[in-house]
């Protein structure tokens, strides 16, 4: 996987995002790379989105993407996770209180996103997170990229 250096889009600054594992899974299942989850991952690969992570997120990526039911090639999983580690930012969690999470394993993504000003959390499962403007679907992230004048991210 080729990865570009982070870019700034039309002077609007870098885009930082914690990316939920379901977005990676969905992108790897997209055969033509034009799905919104694929566009989000392509934006990471092109340096348009800087991923935020911590050791728990990386561990979850490896665990979930390596499950036999998905049949993803180990070298593809290693390559994708390596891009997140090499070009992302290892980010501490910001503890949150008084928020409800139906799946406690998702809290780490929320807390990592909360640790960086103006960061997003990109997920295919909005119902797993509090309703906040920074918690967005892959489709919404693609719209954000379009509004910032990001060149094609499907290549």
PLM ranges: what are they?
Residues 26-28, 64, 132, 144-145:
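Residues that scaffold the ATP/ADP-binding catalytic core of kinase and kinase-like folds
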Residues 119-122, 126-155:
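Acidic, PIN/NYN-like endoribonuclease modules and their adjacent C-terminal/linker elements
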Residues 42-96:
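PIN-domain endoribonuclease scaffold, especially VapC-family toxins
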Residues 85-121:
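Active-site neighborhoods of divalent-metal-dependent phosphate/nucleic-acid chemistry enzymes
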């Amino acid at each position: 996987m080729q990865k570009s250096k982070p870019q700034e889009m039309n002077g609007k600054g870098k885009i930082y995002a914690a990316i939920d594992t379901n977005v990676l899974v969905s992108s790897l299942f997209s055969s033509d790379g034009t799905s919104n989850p694929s566009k989000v991952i392509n934006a990471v690969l092109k340096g348009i989105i800087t991923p935020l992570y911590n050791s728990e997120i990386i561990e979850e990526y490896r665990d979930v993407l390596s499950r036999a039911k998905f049949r993803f090639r180990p070298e593809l999983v290693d390559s994708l996770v390596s891009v997140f580690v090499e070009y992302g930012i290892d980010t501490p969690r910001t503890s949150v209180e008084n928020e409800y999470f139906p799946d406690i394993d998702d809290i780490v993504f929320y807390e990592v996103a909360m640790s960086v000003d103006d960061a997003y959390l990109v997920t295919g499962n909005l119902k797993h997170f509090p309703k906040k403007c920074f918690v967005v679907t892959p489709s919404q992230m693609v719209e954000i990229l379009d509004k910032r004048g990001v060149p094609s991210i499907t290549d």
